[in-house]
């Protein structure tokens, strides 16, 4: 399952069947698409399989996430997310992947009339009081079928990497929704230890959460829209890591750091949000 690490301007990875999913941008194309040097550097690093940090907004969660392209996940990446961030590891996926795999938002499942009638507790537990948004991005959680418990760094890396690779294979080969869902079930089970967050339809035009931001970075880098990440917390765990400390971490480890405004401004200037 080891991916092939690309150069800064191209992306390719080996699938389970040794086929390649490849997308390439010339340096000039990346420059035109990305614009500001800081954003360009971040996208080039991400396209090369390196991490990027994103602070959403002081008007939203006020959180910084450390992000990696899903198909480049290794046990070392998972360990870094676990040790350096402290928050929940999550897999952000593009809405087109969610549609192909028919992954429902948990909020929709929990408000399904038939299920609520069968399990009335779901009505008591409904999400109607989010302070940062109207709807949660969480869908199902998954484990790869070749994992044991699914929680080890090795297990979670396998789950993350193969989901990213499989998503690329599905999109590249034009599988039907049913074929995609069968392929997903062949390799994965639920529940699992990788929570999946699905992009809102319309992307950043409809929701400006970390899910949409993480997916947009992958798209800009020419990668499959699957990104693994975790929220960065204060050492005592009592709150999000202050943005100043997040920037210091980014500088210390030479990781590009962006804000939600950076990405929204880029998409606004280019007349697109996806």
Per-region residue spans from a language model:
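Cysteine-centered motifs
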Residues: 7-9
């Amino acid at each position: 399952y080891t991916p092939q690490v690309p150069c800064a301007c191209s992306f390719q990875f080996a699938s389970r069947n040794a086929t390649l999913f490849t997308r390439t941008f010339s340096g000039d194309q990346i420059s035109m698409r990305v614009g500001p040097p800081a954003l360009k550097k971040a996208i080039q690093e991400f396209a090369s399989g390196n991490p990027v940090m994103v602070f959403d907004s002081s008007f939203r969660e006020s959180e910084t996430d450390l992000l990696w392209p899903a198909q480049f996940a290794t046990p070392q990446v998972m360990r870094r997310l676990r040790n350096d961030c402290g928050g929940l590891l999550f897999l952000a996926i593009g809405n087109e992947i969610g549609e192909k795999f028919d992954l429902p938002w948990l909020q929709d499942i929990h408000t399904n009339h038939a299920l609520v009638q069968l399990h009335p507790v779901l009505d008591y537990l409904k999400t109607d009081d989010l302070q940062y948004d109207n709807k949660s991005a969480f869908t199902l959680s998954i484990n790869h079928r070749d994992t044991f418990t699914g929680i080890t760094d090795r297990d979670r890396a396998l789950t993350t990497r193969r989901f990213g690779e499989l998503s690329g294979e599905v999109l590249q080969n034009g599988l039907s929704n049913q074929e995609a869902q069968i392929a997903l079930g062949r390799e994965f089970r639920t529940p699992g230890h990788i929570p999946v967050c699905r992009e809102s339809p319309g992307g950043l035009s409809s929701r400006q959460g970390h899910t949409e931001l993480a997916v947009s970075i992958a798209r800009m880098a020419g990668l499959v829209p699957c990104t693994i990440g975790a929220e960065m917390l204060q050492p005592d765990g009592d709150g999000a890591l202050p943005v100043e400390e997040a920037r210091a971490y980014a500088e210390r480890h030479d990781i590009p750091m962006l804000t939600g405004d950076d990405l929204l401004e880029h998409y606004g200037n280019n007349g697109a949000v996806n």
